[in-house]
From Swiss-Prot:
Protein's organism: Bacillus subtilis (strain 168)
Residues reported to bind ATP: 34-41
Entry-linked Pfam families: ABC_tran
Keywords tagged on the record: Amino-acid transport, ATP-binding, Cell membrane, Membrane, Nucleotide-binding, Translocase, Transport
Function, as annotated: Part of the ABC transporter complex GlnHMPQ involved in glutamine transport. Probably responsible for energy coupling to the transport system.
Induction (free text): Positively regulated by TnrA under nitrogen-limited conditions.
Protein name according to UniProt: Glutamine transport ATP-binding protein GlnQ
């Protein structure tokens, strides 16, 4: 479904992603972990061309993302993204935030979009917040609205870029619970996170990246019990003993 072939990304002289080769299948939950500044968020953001690549080929459902002829807006309709900071419109209600893209992009009628928005608010556990404004919500609730907004476009894949790192500790669980439900329902998910418990429980595969390179890929049980790379062992010992 998503394929990186010899992908490289530079910021000027800084080589951010180095020869990335990665295949993500439909229905798979892939968690990308690694130290800060390792390139994991950049890798994620290349999937919907929020970041462009300099070399190599990146395809989503057979469409080359980096081809100039590709209609990236068409591709993005099938890719939901949830950011660290929620990016909700402060002057629109929760319902209006979720309805916006289905009406503008999918050309749904307002009635249909409203029904879709209410359905996904129910799914993320906050149906009673439809008429609230973002400022009236906790961080966890805002992030759940952001997830509902992504789902309302009925994407084929959801990207999560450190979705819990801006949240207070007691709100992290409510967001992870929603993500666990999505994973169980078969949503293709690519997640950048420091939530090791979530990765262990939900991931089909863990990808460890450091200094722009994929150093290790493994199923969680194997990765946690016996990481092959010394750098991965060091990272895990620091994170798990923190």
């Amino acid at each position: 479904m998503i394929t990186f072939q010899n992908v490289n990304k530079h910021y000027g002289d800084f080589h951010v992603l180095k020869q990335i080769n990665l295949q993500i299948e439909k229905g798979e939950v892939v968690v990308i972990i690694g130290p800060s500044g390792s390139g994991k968020s950049t890798l994620l953001r290349c999937i919907n061309r929020l970041e462009s690549i300099n070399e190599g080929v990146l395809t989503v459902n057979g469409t080359a993302i980096n081809d100039r002829k590709t209609d990236i807006n068409q591709v993005r309709q099938n890719i939901g993204m949830v950011f660290q900071h929620f990016h909700l419109y402060p002057h629109k209600t929760v319902l209006q935030n979720i309805m916006l893209a289905p009406v503008k992009v999918l050309r749904q009628s307002p009635e249909q979009a409203k029904e879709t928005a209410r359905y996904y608010l129910e799914k993320v556990g906050i149906p009673d917040k439809a008429d609230a404004y973002p400022s009236q919500l906790s961080g966890g609730q805002q992030q759940r609205v952001a997830i509902a907004r992504g789902l309302a476009m009925k994407p084929e894949v959801m990207l999560f870029d450190e979705p819990t790192s801006a949240l207070d500790p007691e709100m992290i669980g409510e967001v992870l619970d929603v993500m666990k439900t999505l994973a169980k329902e078969g949503m293709t998910m690519v997640v950048v996170t420091h939530e090791m418990g979530f990765a262990k429980e939900v991931a089909d595969r863990i990808v460890f990246i450091d200094e722009g390179k994929i150093l290790e890929e493994a199923v969680p049980a194997e990765f946690y019990a016996n990481p092959k790379e010394e750098r991965a062992r060091l990272f895990l010992s620091r994170i798990l003993n923190h």
